[in-house]
């Protein structure tokens, strides 16, 4: 991998990690189109630490408040004593499904499911489910029913959105895409669904990145070029990711996710055509 490739992959990761279009799909598709080697699941997991940093920086006040409140609640023997403490436990609960499924299906995630056929199918299927979620939200608003805010997220919402996050282990699904879709199906507002999605990503992305970094440390440090490429890609993804978070939260205040649905359908169909025509290999 060249330094230019590392920078481009970092930009791709930062742009697509938080938009519901799948960063893993793009990190798999674009190298295939460009004739580069597949960067691999480990590379993808490690550079996500950059986008993890973007979430921590953007939501730093929320995170500090949640951590402080959870600690206070534990000290006082009342874990759910306020909204911030409750949110901390909802994030913890929502993380359980992806941990369980990630450990159970780790081999398949890193091999079989990285096939471009799986990715194209995931792009299309989630677009259809997200379209259904948007229809449900539109109908609810037309009937005059309110949408849920962060304060309304309870155990049921946290666990179900956590299950949606576990589906994102299938490359092409999009972690933000599945969790935002899950939130919309549970009647969260678009902005609330996105905000909870980003906060929910923290434990899972940190754990995956740290694990892959530990597992591949000897391989990475064996070549100074590997260290440089990973560092550059990670930093680039963090900078671009921060801008993507700001964009999406602002965008969803007054827009639906229709543009992302259309993009996913076009990308999935286009990928199938390229595979069918032999332009790229699965």
UniProtKB/Swiss-Prot annotation:
It catalyses: di-trans,octa-cis-undecaprenyl diphosphate + H2O = di-trans,octa-cis-undecaprenyl phosphate + phosphate + H(+). It is an enzyme of class 3 (hydrolase). The chain crosses the membrane at residues 1-21, 39-59, 85-105, 115-135, 153-173, 193-213, 229-249, 259-279. InterPro entries: UppP. The keyword Electron transport does not apply. It is found in: Cell inner membrane. It comes from the Bacteria. One of its GO terms (molecular function) is undecaprenyl-diphosphatase activity. Catalyzes the dephosphorylation of undecaprenyl diphosphate (UPP). Confers resistance to bacitracin. HAMAP family: Undec_diphosphatase. Bacitracin is thought to be involved in the inhibition of peptidoglycan synthesis by sequestering undecaprenyl diphosphate, thereby reducing the pool of lipid carrier available. This is Undecaprenyl-diphosphatase. It comes from Chlorobium luteolum (strain DSM 273 / BCRC 81028 / 2530). The lineage of its organism: Bacteria, Pseudomonadati, Chlorobiota, Chlorobiia, Chlorobiales.
């Amino acid at each position: 991998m060249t330094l230019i490739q590392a920078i481009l992959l970092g930009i791709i990761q930062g742009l697509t990690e938080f938009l519901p279009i799948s960063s893993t799909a793009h990190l798999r598709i674009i190298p295939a189109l460009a004739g580069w080697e597949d960067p691999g699941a480990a590379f993808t997991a490690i550079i996500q630490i950059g986008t993890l940093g973007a979430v921590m920086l953007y939501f730093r006040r929320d995170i500090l408040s949640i951590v402080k409140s959870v600690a206070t609640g534990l000290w006082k023997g009342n874990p759910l004593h306020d909204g911030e403490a409750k949110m901390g436990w909802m994030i913890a609960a929502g993380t359980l499904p992806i941990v369980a499924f990630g450990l159970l299906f780790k081999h398949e995630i890193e091999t079989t499911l990285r096939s471009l056929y799986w990715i194209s199918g995931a792009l299309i299927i989630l677009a259809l489910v997200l379209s259904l979620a948007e229809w449900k939200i539109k109908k609810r608003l037309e009937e005059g029913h309110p949408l849920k805010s962060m304060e309304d997220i309870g155990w049921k919402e946290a666990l179900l959105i956590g299950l949606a996050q576990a589906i994102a282990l299938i490359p092409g699904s999009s972690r933000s895409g599945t969790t935002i879709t899950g939130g919309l199906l549970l009647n969260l507002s678009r902005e609330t669904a996105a905000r909870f999605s980003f906060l929910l990503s923290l434990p899972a992305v940190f754990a995956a990145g740290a694990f892959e970094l530990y597992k591949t440390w000897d391989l990475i440090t064996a070549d100074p070029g590997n260290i440089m490429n990973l560092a550059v890609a990670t930093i680039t993804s963090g900078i671009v990711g921060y801008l993507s978070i700001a964009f999406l939260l602002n965008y969803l205040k007054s827009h639906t996710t229709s543009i992302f649905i259309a993009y996913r359908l076009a990308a999935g169909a286009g990928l199938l055509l390229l595979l069918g025509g032999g332009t790229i290999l699965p």
